[in-house]
Amino acid sequence: MKVCQRKTIDTEKMSSVGDTACADLSEKKDNEKKKRSRVKQLLSDVKKQVEFWFGDVNLHKDRFMKSIIEQSRDGYIDIAVLTTFNRMKNLTADVKLIARALKNSTIVEVNDEGTRIRRKEPLGETPKDVDSRTVYVELLPKTVTHIWLERVFSKCGHVVYISIPRYKSTRHSKGFAFVEFETQEQAQKAVEMLNNPPEDAPRKPGIFPKTCRKKAVPFDAVTQDNDEDGKKKKTELKNSTSEETGSNNMDQDGMLESTVTSEPNLATLTSTVSKKAKKKRLRSQSFEASSGEDQFEMSSKMRKVEEEKSELKDLSSENKDEELNSLKKKDDSVLKAKRKRKKKLKERLKVGEEVIPLRVLSKKEWLDLKQEYLTLQKRCMAHLKQSVFQINQKPTNYHIVKLKEDDTNAFYKDTPKKELTSGPEFLSGVIVKISYNQPLPSKRCIKDMLSELSPVAYVDLLDGDTEGHVRFKSSEDAQKVIKARFEFQKKYNWNLELLSGDHERRYWQKILVDRQAKLNTPREKKRGTEKLISKAEKIIIAKAKEASNHIRFDD
């Protein structure tokens, strides 16, 4: 019987364990079913972005997208092209997910395969009232984004397009942007509501404040006055507290001196009291061994002095209290006025519980300012060009007399025109090879050393090379150097060798190849204002060098 009971208990335990295991598995399956990918927000973001790219406002400005649509016959574009854009890379690279997001779109339609999309309606003509619906914004932080601008300006109306110009090298914002609204009234509302430049901003729009790299324009410029007032109040309170603590800690003599400095009206009284106190001290020291009656008289006199001191303390404290009360009243009146101003500003410019110091004006006004700037720039450049021309016309040597017009014309007629040089002509026996077991000195040093015997045409040598070539003007000049090669070897340890035969022919081929490569290298072309400014900079550098030279007079 006991064995049967044990078996039944074991079977019951096993069945209970199995039930718990099954329950755990079912719970896990239920949890797995509940967990699903949250793509609702992603689908809406993808739809919003693609509809913006294919919208009328963007296609009138985006030449790349417009060219892709025009190149396709039926207007369809592969969805894979959109996945190459940076904005879409940040969202998703799944073509099926993009097609799923655009199923219910009102602007674009997807083909049956779900791989291509196109606009439902053809693109119309460009609207003519774009400038009147656009506002210009400046004094923006370096890290400004489209989302931030849309959040700020959407309080004034429906924002359809935002353009943030950036530098090509760093891709940082230039500090200004253009915001396009749906209607002209919304743009006018943005100008009235958000035009709040800070006090330290430049007076004329279009000139942006210089900020450090990746550093935003300070947004606490509006509350600067309040901060300054707060600082003033703090310093005044600190001074008053220090005076009170000092008066409590000082002894009686120090207290009298402080009252002299703080209250000029009581200066005479304090001086007389201090003199009396000193006299009484001397008397007390001289009459220490006197009778009890004298001591009683001295104590009564000292009491009088103490009473006078207490009266002075009361007067000084009353004056201080009056001054503090008057200062507090002034501060309260100033603060009330500031609060009223701040309330007005907040009511007019509050966007997301922050007052944003921006300069906002219509694009038409900005275009007028731009035209004014361009005309001023042209005028300045014309003046600079004229001054550069006048400087270049002046002769550098002032001892030369100016030629007459006839002489100059005759001179220009007689001078032959420069012909295009085809490079150095082949001459045998003019190339000398120079070698050394250590790096050779500079080109200038070698040219100066060899020019003592015969003139040098060119030194072909790079810094740090142990071998080089020197080209002379004639074979006779090269022979002179070769004859003196033992002297150079003793003096500088150089090995000089005259090239001939195949070695000479190869070196001449190398000269022609190097020259052609140098001529074929693209040069940086400077045109317009850049060219003019570079000329002006060269003239300034030359003038500075002339000014730095010492003037030496003959004895």
Swiss-Prot record:
The xRRM domain is annotated at 425-538
Chain spans, region Disordered: 218-327
One GO molecular-function entry: RNA binding
Q: Which InterPro entries match?
A: La_dom_prot (IPR045180), La_HTH (IPR006630), La_xRRM (IPR014886), LARP7_RRM1 (IPR034887), LARP7_RRM2 (IPR034910), Lupus_La (IPR002344), Nucleotide-bd_a/b_plait_sf (IPR012677), RBD_domain_sf (IPR035979)
Q: Which residues form a coiled coil?
A: 295-356
One annotated Gene Ontology cellular component of this protein: nucleoplasm
The main location is: nucleus
Q: Which residues form the RRM domain?
A: 133-211
Inactivation phenotype: Mild cardiac phenotype with increased phosphorylation of 'Ser-2' on RNA polymerase II.
* Feature: compositional bias, Basic and acidic residues: 303-327
Gene Ontology terms describing biological process? box C/D sno(s)RNA 3'-end processing; cardiac muscle tissue regeneration; cell differentiation; mRNA processing; positive regulation of protein localization to Cajal body; positive regulation of snRNA transcription by RNA polymerase II; regulation of cardiac muscle cell proliferation; regulation of mRNA splicing, via spliceosome
Residue ranges, compositional bias (Polar residues): 238-251, 258-274, 284-293
Keyword Cytoplasm appears in the UniProt entry = no
Which keywords describe this protein according to UniProt? Answer: Coiled coil, Differentiation, mRNA processing, mRNA splicing, Nucleus, RNA-binding, Spermatogenesis, Transcription, Transcription regulation
In what residue span(s) does the HTH La-type RNA-binding domain sit? 36-127
Localization: Nucleus, Nucleoplasm
Domain of life of the organism encoding this protein: Eukaryota
Summarizing the function annotation, the protein's role is: RNA-binding protein that specifically binds distinct small nuclear RNA (snRNAs) and regulates their processing and function. Specifically binds the 7SK snRNA (7SK RNA) and acts as a core component of the 7SK ribonucleoprotein (RNP) complex, thereby acting as a negative regulator of transcription elongation by RNA polymerase II. The 7SK RNP complex sequesters the positive transcription elongation factor b (P-TEFb) in a large inactive 7SK RNP complex preventing RNA polymerase II phosphorylation and subsequent transcriptional elongation.
Family stated for the protein in its record = Belongs to the LARP7 family.
Q: How does it assemble?
A: Core component of the 7SK RNP complex. Associates with box C/D small nucleolar ribonucleoprotein (snoRNP) complexes.
User: What note about domains is in the entry?
Assistant: The xRRM domain binds the 3' end of 7SK snRNA (7SK RNA) at the top of stem-loop 4.
Question: What is the name of the protein in this document?
Answer: La-related protein 7
Could you tell me the gene encoding this protein? larp7
